């Protein structure tokens, strides 16, 4: 089930509600990444506390470990991980195509070696849909071929055409499995505007309830990613949710919303947190730096997260330098809370018709830098 209601537009920025089998999501929304069924350094209560509405699970990794036979015993991923809100799963394609020296690609699918035990495995649109059906994610993704940003036009066109054929196979398999959830198509085309449009037009035939923009944030320069968003955002169908995969920094989220994107996921806030890189309203802070050793202030005095309300930069600096697990947890709570606050503020700004003003103030604040 998927029902998307668009409540308000302010320029291309959108404010909507997405109804799924495990609950409603207010958009625009950021989805924390739970690769193996857990958001690193967070438990489900932490996620509820920061007001996470939906999380992402990784089909490839969950297929390899713990395996479908385990998750199936719990009725799907929700029961296995103790999370009662919506879940989105990717198709597994990105991870498989990252194994460039360990895989063989054909029209049927992709053969690769398991990085865990060396077993020979095969992923096809049909198998990806089977895995995601067992996971019972609220939103599943079609299997597509993920092309790097530097792909030639000829390679990009050939790839997107195969992704369109795989989109058709994904949808048929999804329906044959009687999956009650939603399946999104993925717009590909590398860094070529006309190919992106060709991909989008090809997907229209299959009438997916939502569309994702894939193949960005894969090593291309930031201006190139923004150029593609500028080109693709305005032509995405208005009545469907728009998902930008694997992006990104706070600035990327704001640029995406300004160009019509409703949904985001990225490992950046969690990965950076574990490395002592904290996001704040006034720029980024590296908690490992020695200048924080005696600093009694919180990460951000305007932040209401658990870490900022209870602990000093000095303590977080100590935890990070000592390699304490609590340090990673508190840093992650802060970063994900900050991302959720940004999204909530953008939702409110669009509702009030003041998104451009909010955006200008956001950039001014971020450029100021942290004291």
Curated annotation (Swiss-Prot):
Its cofactor is Zn(2+). GO terms for biological process: queuosine biosynthetic process; tRNA wobble guanine modification; tRNA-guanine transglycosylation. Gene3D superfamilies: Queuine tRNA-ribosyltransferase-like. GO terms for cellular component: cytosol. Binds 1 zinc ion per subunit. It catalyses: 7-aminomethyl-7-carbaguanine + guanosine(34) in tRNA = 7-aminomethyl-7-carbaguanosine(34) in tRNA + guanine. The active site is at 90 (proton acceptor), 265 (nucleophile). Substrate binds at residues 90-94, 144, 188, 215. NCBIfam families: Q_tRNA_tgt (TIGR00430), tgt_general (TIGR00449). Catalyzes the base-exchange of a guanine (G) residue with the queuine precursor 7-aminomethyl-7-deazaguanine (PreQ1) at position 34 (anticodon wobble position) in tRNAs with GU(N) anticodons (tRNA-Asp, -Asn, -His and -Tyr). Catalysis occurs through a double-displacement mechanism. The nucleophile active site attacks the C1' of nucleotide 34 to detach the guanine base from the RNA, forming a covalent enzyme-RNA intermediate. The proton acceptor active site deprotonates the incoming PreQ1, allowing a nucleophilic attack on the C1' of the ribose to form the product. Belongs to the queuine tRNA-ribosyltransferase family. This is Queuine tRNA-ribosyltransferase. It comes from Neisseria gonorrhoeae (strain NCCP11945). The gene is tgt.
């Amino acid at each position: 089930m998927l029902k998307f209601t668009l409540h308000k537009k302010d320029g291309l920025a959108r404010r909507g509600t997405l109804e799924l089998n495990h609950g409603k999501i207010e958009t625009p929304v950021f989805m924390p990444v739970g690769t193996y069924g857990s958001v690193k350094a967070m438990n489900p209560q932490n996620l509820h506390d920061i007001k996470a509405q939906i999380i992402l699970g990784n089909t490839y990794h969950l297929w390899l470990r713990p395996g479908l036979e385990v998750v199936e015993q719990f009725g799907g991923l929700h029961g296995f991980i103790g999370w009662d809100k919506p879940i989105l799963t990717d198709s597994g394609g990105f991870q498989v195509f990252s194994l460039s020296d360990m895989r063989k690609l054909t029209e049927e699918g992709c053969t690769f070696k398991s990085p865990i035990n060396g077993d020979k495995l095969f992923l096809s649109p049909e198998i990806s849909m089977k895995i995601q059906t067992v996971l019972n994610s609220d939103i599943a993704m079609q299997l597509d071929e993920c092309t790097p940003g530097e792909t030639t036009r000829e390679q990009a066109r050939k790839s997107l055409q195969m992704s369109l054929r795989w989109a058709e196979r994904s949808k048929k398999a999804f329906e044959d499995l009687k999956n009650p959830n939603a399946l999104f198509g993925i717009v590909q085309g590398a860094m070529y505007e006309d190919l992106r449009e060709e991909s989008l037009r090809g997907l229209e035939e299959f009438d997916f309830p939502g569309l994702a923009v894939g193949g960005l944030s894969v090593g291309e320069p930031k201006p190139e990613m923004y150029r593609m968003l500028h080109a693709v955002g305005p032509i995405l169908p208005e009545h469907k949710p728009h998902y930008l995969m694997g992006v990104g920094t706070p600035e990327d989220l704001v640029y995406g919303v300004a160009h019509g994107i409703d949904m985001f996921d990225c490992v950046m806030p969690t990965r950076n947190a574990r490395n002592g890189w904290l996001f704040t309203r006034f720029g980024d802070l590296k908690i490992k730096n020695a200048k924080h050793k005696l600093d009694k202030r919180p990460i951000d005095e305007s932040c209401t997260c658990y870490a900022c309300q209870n602990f000093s930069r000095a303590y977080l600096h100590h935890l990070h330098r000592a390699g304490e697990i609590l340090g990673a947890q508190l840093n992650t709570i802060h970063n994900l809370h900050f991302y959720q606050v940004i999204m909530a503020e953008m939702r409110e700004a669009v509702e009030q018709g003041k998104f451009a003003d909010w955006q200008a103030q956001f950039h001014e604040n971020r450029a100021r830098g942290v004291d």
